[in-house]
Amino acid sequence: MRKSIGLMLAATLVSSGSAKPREVRHLAPSSQWVVNWADQSCSLGRAFGEGDHKVTLFFDQFEPGDNFNLMVAGKRIDEVEGWPAAAVQFGPNEEPSEATAVGAKTNDTPAIIFQGGQRIAPLTKVEKIARRRNAEDGPPFEPAPIGPAREKAATWLLISKIQHFDLLLDTGPMDAPLAALRDCSWDMVKSWGLDVEQQKHLSAKAYPTMPAYKWFSENDYPTAMLKSGSQAIVNFRVLVDATGKPTACQIQTSTRPKAFDDVVCANIMKRARFHPALSAAGKPVPSFWRQTVNFRLAM
């Protein structure tokens, strides 16, 4: 059994499609959009379908912006093993994007979490190259905002390649729901003690002085969790002062057990150092940095 700890910077897995026509389950909404304003994350959710065919779609966001994590849950959702590839598409105008799927349960209901940071529109080839180029030692690559017009044009979501059927959800225009999600995220930033207007107009975001994956090694895998075969996904954020020093680490969401959370924050506070964020005037200011750590066991 091999152990690995990976920092989730991008999902690049590709799976081949099947030539056989696939069943498509097309579901209309059966509830309104609801935003859950939690202390360390924001979640936008809506139910689709009725009875045993009902599924609930969640957009989880841990910082303001265009990125979110998708989760879909329902009695008829197939349980997923491992970390298989999936495809996610917001139609009718946007191209499909690739994501890594992880099986989960919410209130004993099967669920799938899509890792890798989803957007309404996937990154272009040029944007992906720029992101890879900056990932090692440069400032974070910031693609152009998608904007409300493209979000409004997205009226359905297709999830494919991961179940024995494809799931087509009539979301309706996504501009207003995602705007509500971002409102929650900015309020969350305010609750961290940061100046929201200042954070909205930074000339540079905080970023690590060395590749963040170097903060972790296989030896950091909790021994008890290794023996029990436990794995985890840990979303965290770090407050960074004007000198680039981390001042607080907070777990935003985690699939637990808690031993994984403790390893993440202990390593961050001990090993992480950052280039500080810069205000609109170019002055170093307090800010935050966030990421996801995956603890995986490879058989």
Model-derived regions: residue spans:
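An ectodomain-focused feature that recognizes extracytoplasmic/extracellular
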Residues: 20-86
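Sec-dependent signal peptide recognition
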Residues: 2-8
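Extended low-complexity, serine/threonine- and proline-enriched intrinsically disordered segments
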Residues: 73-117
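Short proline/glycine- and basic residue-enriched helix-capping loop/turn segments at helix->loop/beta transitions
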Residues: 199-239, 262-299
